[in-house]
Amino acid sequence: MSAVTPAGGDTTADRSWPALLNGLLDGRDLSADDTAWALDVIMRGEATDVQIAGFAVGLRFKGETVEEISGLVRTMYEHANVIEVPGKTVDIVGTGGDGAKTVNISTMSAIVLAGTGAKVVKHGNRAASSASGASDVLEKLGVNLELTPQRVAEVAEEAGITFCFAVKFHPALRHVATARGQLGIRTVFNFLGPLTNPARVKAQAVGVAHARMAPIVAGVFAERGHSSLVFRGDDGLDELTTTSTSRVWVVRDGRVTEETFDPRDVGIELVPVEALRGADASYNADVARRLLAGEKGPVRDAVLLNSAAALEALEPGEGALAERLRAGMDRAAEAIDSGAARRVLERWVAVSHA
């Protein structure tokens, strides 16, 4: 049995797996120090798969809290290969899990964002709910992802955009792989990636497919002092969707404000989700190339909208949310139509192989 004395020397409350798991099953919330301890044991390879699975399922059974996830985020960073990227940076990512198999909206949006002049540090992995993951598509577009952390940071300066491949920056997560794979269900580990960008990005647009978790994710960003837009489509997509309305949690100055957003308020007509459907990485990469070449249609609308969400997180404005997003969409459209976004990708490919 693993046990630890909490900070402050409280020897009457030694932490152990039975104590934590019983607490979860009794419906008691854990402290940030509790969850930080548990994940530290896990990431040092000192927990069994049964303990890991019990912890993950117990948290979901009870319902994760902002404080519990904040403790996990703290430990994730302690075990991560973090990098320093000077200046204001932004990330755009989805948690996955919506099962819609759409094209890679956040990946295309990241490139367009960089085309507007924003410095983008994207954190991602293999496929979760898209037909292919960010890394799969970027490889098909020619971006070299086999870079050292130091080189990843340098690429951000040279190209205005870079990609942190989660498995390379959070290697200690290998210890949860077996338990996660055998469980086959959503757990808190599905949400930690978007919360732990290795560059410690302070602005992000994050899509969350799970309704209960979206405001929790927003709360974690607020607790950490970030400027963020967290959203969930009322169709279940982990995007600012164009097939229905969305719920948006605007995080600013440590506070969270919830709003409803209708894409028709920015001139986008609703489309069926099939209009955003993707396929394998080669297909999705071709969609990205056509977008950057100026192709109009539902995919472009979705990319402009999500790019605007990230711009709003990076440079928060005043006034109605729809007005702020409309202004961001205009900037994103100019980045595409001027060729700036396409040139960003070309530069990214070149410097990633230098």
Curated annotation (Swiss-Prot):
This is Anthranilate phosphoribosyltransferase 1. Pathway: Amino-acid biosynthesis; L-tryptophan biosynthesis; L-tryptophan from chorismate: step 2/5. NCBIfam families: trpD (TIGR01245). Mg(2+) 1 binds at S106, E239. The lineage of its organism: Bacteria, Bacillati, Actinomycetota, Actinomycetes, Kitasatosporales. 5-phospho-alpha-D-ribose 1-diphosphate binds at residues 94, 97-98, 102, 104-107, 122-130, 134. It catalyses: N-(5-phospho-beta-D-ribosyl)anthranilate + diphosphate = 5-phospho-alpha-D-ribose 1-diphosphate + anthranilate. Its cofactor is Mg(2+). One of its GO terms (cellular component) is cytosol. Anthranilate 1 binds at G94, N125. The keyword Isomerase does not apply. One of its GO terms (molecular function) is magnesium ion binding. InterPro entries: Anthranilate_Pribosyl_Tfrase (IPR005940), Glycosyl_Trfase_fam3 (IPR000312), Glycosyl_Trfase_fam3_N_dom (IPR017459), Glycosyl_Trfase_fam3_N_dom_sf (IPR036320), Nuc_phospho_transferase (IPR035902). It is an enzyme of class 2 (transferase). Anthranilate 2 binds at R180. It comes from the Bacteria.
